[in-house]
Design a protein with these regions (language model features):
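Bacterial N-terminal signal peptides
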Residues: 1-6
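Aromatic- and Gly/Pro-enriched helix-to-coil junctions and flexible linker segments
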Residues: 8-160, 164, 172, 176, ...
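Conserved hydrophobic/aromatic "anchor" residues
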Residues: 26-27, 107, 439, 470, ...
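His-enriched metal-coordination microenvironments in redox/metal-binding proteins
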Residues: 128-403
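Extracellular/periplasmic ectodomains of large secreted or surface enzymes and adhesion receptors
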Residues: 395-434, 440-442, 495
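Primarily EF-hand calcium-binding motifs
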Residues: 432-446, 466-478
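Amphipathic regulatory helices of Ca2+-sensor modules
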Residues: 449-463, 483-494
Length: 495
């Protein structure tokens, strides 16, 4: 369990509401409203603490519903509305419109009339509990993971064999914890069939991206026709599990369900992380800003979705696109909630041109005024546990004109390749080995080792060079790169 500085929340009080809209009943309006915004979680077997899919359920929880809706706690949705558009740009926007709130408050204020059952919508159904429908394949842990009663647990990495006999294109993914009460989040990565305990694949690090995901508020990835992710023949799935003990020793066996595309897609869906892993948040800082970017995107892309990820001190987040000297805010979250790490999916993909910059900015509250802060007297840096912090701006995207299976331009490998090209001012290194060529350029003091500061000095416009890429090359973790370690760059960029 993670301690908080103070107990968050306040007493619930009933507020008087207008008794206008007296014709609003459960069956003619409220049932539909709850189906659209609430029932996906608040149903039997859902992640919500109680169901809201019947009249009796809605009436029993009416005072609480009004309070949490009025305070903006529910439904969980934190993006600022784009006032330049009449409709939300987000296809999964859970927020209630002003008219929907009026209807809900009027119904509760008028003593929750039931109305005519004939006007009620058809109840939503969920196939065998799977939100994505019946999966074509389900993979589960070979044996449960034991979760202790108290304290913290390091991330558990569980590898599951798929035994797939051919490459598959996947149109829908759902991660289902066996014990949701102790699973805070899950990241799933693809691991090649020939890798056991050796170096992880390019994506097997939360800083690089994810293949599948389970976080509070999001357990599915569903793509329209023509869009899919690939899982290779014989691949393994690496589940990175973040468990949060809840006072009782227990165990968990998580599953993942996949729905295969009927044919090869037109677009391969990819994920990149906009990351700053080198930040330090001072003790007591109540609005500490951290910035990361992908400068000069190497090729045209279309963004499908964003998923910002921070921990308990996360306060606010924003994605910006810098193009032609102008800055455009793409997603603004002034009130970030660690308990609801939501995916924000565009109704229509948004184009980003080669040379544009994607920037992810986050603000952190490490003060005693943050009731969820475990320790306001501590300097905080990057780390895997909840009491540590992260600065991760995930971007889900496609590359127009590329073929499924082509190299990923925003992966660490793709970005390293682009950084090397830019560094040499051309299409690549003139040397047989990129690492040897770089060593000569980076070893400014001639001591035979490359420090993080030396890399930062040469790549000051590319934070990934001195963080993500540096860490991947520093195999002995001594904070220095020797010539042998830097030669591994040839493997990373495919030279």
């Amino acid at each position: 369990m993670v301690s908080a500085t103070a107990a968050p929340g306040c007493l619930l009080e009933q507020k008087p509401v207008s008794k206008s809209l007296s014709d609003v009943t459960y069956h003619n309006q409220i049932a539909r409203l709850l189906q659209r915004h609430c029932v996906e979680c608040h149903r039997e077997g859902g992640v919500g603490p109680f169901a809201l899919d019947t009249y009796e359920d809605a009436v029993a929880h009416a005072p609480m519903i009004r309070e949490v809706v009025d305070r903006g706690i529910m439904p969980p949705w934190f993006a600022v509305a784009d006032k330049s558009h009449s409709t939300s740009p987000w296809i999964n926007d859970r927020s209630l419109s002003a008219s929907e709130k009026q209807q809900l408050f009027a119904w509760i204020g008028n003593k929750t009339p039931a109305g005519d059952p004939k006007q009620s919508p058809v109840p939503r159904s969920f196939a065998d509990g799977w939100l994505i429908g019946k999966p074509d394949a389900v993979f589960e842990f070979a044996k449960p993971v034991k979760v202790k009663a108290t304290g913290t647990m390091p991330y558990q990495n569980v590898v599951v064999d798929t035994h797939l006999e051919k490459d598959q294109w996947v149109q829908a993914i759902e991660v289902r914890p066996g014990n949701p009460g102790v699973v805070h989040h899950v990241l799933v990565f693809i691991q090649s069939a020939d890798k056991e305990d050796g170096p992880r694949d390019d994506a097997a690090d939360e800083r690089s991206g994810y293949w599948g995901i389970y976080v509070p508020g999001n357990s599915t990835l569903v793509y329209p026709e023509g869009y899919a992710k690939q899982i290779p023949k014989g691949a393994r799935l690496r589940f990175q599990m973040h468990y949060t003990p809840n006072g009782t020793a227990t165990e968990d066996s998580t599953r993942i369900g996949l729905v295969f595309a009927k044919e090869e897609p037109k677009h391969e869906v990819r994920v990149a992380g906009v990351v700053n892993a080198g930040f330090r948040i001072p003790p007591g800082a109540d609005n500490h800003q951290v910035v990361a970017s992908i400068p000069s995107v190497p090729t045209d892309i279309q963004i499908l979705a964003f998923l910002p990820h921070m921990h308990l001190r996360g306060k606010a987040a924003r994605y910006d696109l810098i193009s032609g000297g102008e800055t455009r805010t793409m997603l603004d979250i002034p009130r970030y909630d660690f308990n609801w790490q939501l995916l924000y999916r565009y109704a229509e993909p948004v184009s980003v041109k080669a040379g544009d910059t994607l920037r992810f900015t986050a603000w952190y509250d490490n003060s005693s005024g943050n009731p969820a802060n475990p320790d306001p007297n501590k300097e905080v840096k990057w780390g895997p546990q909840t009491q540590d912090e992260m600065h991760l701006g995930y971007v889900e995207y496609i590359v127009p004109g590329s073929k499924p299976g082509d190299p990923n331009p925003l992966s660490p490998r793709g970005r390293a390749r682009g950084a090397i090209r830019n560094f040499f001012g051309g299409s690549g290194s003139p040397e047989p080995n990129v690492g040897d060529a770089l060593f000569q350029k980076l070893d400014a003091d001639g001591d035979g080792n490359i420090s993080r500061d030396e890399v930062k000095a040469k790549y000051n416009n590319n934070p990934a060079a001195s963080t993500t890429i540096f860490d991947r090359l520093d195999t002995d973790k001594n904070g220095q790169l020797n010539r042998k370690e830097l030669r591994r760059l040839s493997e990373i960029i495919g030279r």
